[in-house]
């Protein structure tokens, strides 16, 4: 006959709740999972299902949720999840910024679309780069790797009353400059060619104003930009995979002491 044990039930809730806090914090900042198109109820269900799976492999936690230690652990889980998600978001933000620069140089900044995630108008080229990057991330099984990296954090930083090393935040800041540099270098040839083209158009307009080169400037920059993108797109996936792997190596060592 089945006997209900209230203490075992409370212990089950504790072991389900604390991992779910870290998972929900990751979902709030990590790429793909932080999409506004995914309903909050779906995210909540996913978080508790993943937490239930993870809890089977983790040490048991017997700390009351509403105690002082429990509140400190909740804050710690939120910090770990948010930090991990923001670290993964760096690649998308940096490449997204590069797309905005190219769009501005091509004269496509006026062609904007409303982005539901950022609640702002963004250029069509930036939307294209963002969607392309998301598809590459899925093709690379980035969503699975993200959950695997999250599970590894439960091994390196178990659910208990500990204090995060402040150097972790410095690691993320130092890593962000390398990611932004790699992302700019990824699209650097297009940026340089467009810059030289705009500079040449400006010089020609000053040397021979009767030609009225500025009337053709927009058409020329747009055409050259499209041609450059045509030759650049085939090498874009392999370059992004290199950046993804660099992110993977960094995340594996982020929470290691």
From Swiss-Prot:
Listed disulfide bonds for this chain?
none
A GO cellular component annotated for this chain's UniProt record is: plasma membrane
InterPro entries xref list: FliR, T3SS_IM_R
> How does this protein lie in the membrane?
Multi-pass membrane protein
**Which keywords does this chain's UniProt record carry?**
Bacterial flagellum, Cell membrane, Membrane, Transmembrane, Transmembrane helix
Q: Which Pfam families match?
A: Bac_export_1
Tell me which domain of life the UniProt entry assigns to the organism this sequence originates from.
Bacteria
The residues that cross the membrane are: 12-34, 44-66, 79-101, 121-138, 145-164, 179-201, 214-236
Signal peptide segment: none
Gene Ontology BP annotations:
bacterial-type flagellum assembly; protein targeting
Subcellular location(s) per record: Cell membrane; Bacterial flagellum basal body
| Xref: NCBIfam families | fliR
- Stated role: Role in flagellar biosynthesis.
Q: Which family does the record assign?
A: Belongs to the FliR/MopE/SpaR family.
What protein am I looking at?
Flagellar biosynthetic protein FliR
Organism of origin: Buchnera aphidicola subsp. Baizongia pistaciae (strain Bp)
User: Which gene codes for it?
Assistant: fliR
């Amino acid at each position: 006959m089945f006997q209900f044990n209230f203490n075992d039930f409370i212990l089950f809730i504790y072991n389900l709740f604390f991992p779910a806090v870290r998972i929900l914090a990751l979902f709030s900042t990590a790429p793909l999972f932080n999409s506004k198109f995914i309903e909050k109820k779906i995210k909540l269900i996913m978080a508790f299902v993943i937490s239930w799976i993870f809890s089977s492999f983790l040490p048991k936690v017997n700390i009351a949720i509403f105690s002082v230690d429990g509140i400190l652990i909740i804050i710690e889980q939120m910090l770990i999840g948010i930090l991990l998600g923001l670290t993964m978001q760096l690649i998308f933000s940096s490449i997204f910024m590069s797309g905005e620069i190219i769009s501005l140089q091509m004269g496509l900044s006026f062609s904007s679309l409303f982005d539901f995630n950022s609640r702002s108008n963004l250029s069509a080229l930036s939307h294209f780069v963002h969607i392309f990057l998301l598809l590459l991330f899925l093709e690379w099984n980035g969503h699975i790797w993200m959950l695997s990296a999250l599970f590894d954090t439960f091994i390196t930083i178990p659910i208990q009353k500990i204090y995060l090393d402040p150097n972790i935040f410095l690691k993320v800041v130092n890593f962000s400059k390398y990611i932004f540099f790699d992302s700019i270098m990824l699209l650097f040839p297009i940026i340089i060619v467009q810059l030289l083209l705009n500079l040449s158009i400006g010089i020609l307009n000053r040397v021979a104003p009767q030609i009225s080169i500025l009337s053709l400037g927009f058409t020329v920059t747009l055409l050259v930009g499209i041609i450059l993108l045509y030759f650049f797109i085939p090498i874009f996936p392999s370059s992004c995979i290199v950046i993804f792997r660099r992110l993977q190596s960094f995340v594996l060592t982020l929470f290691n002491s």
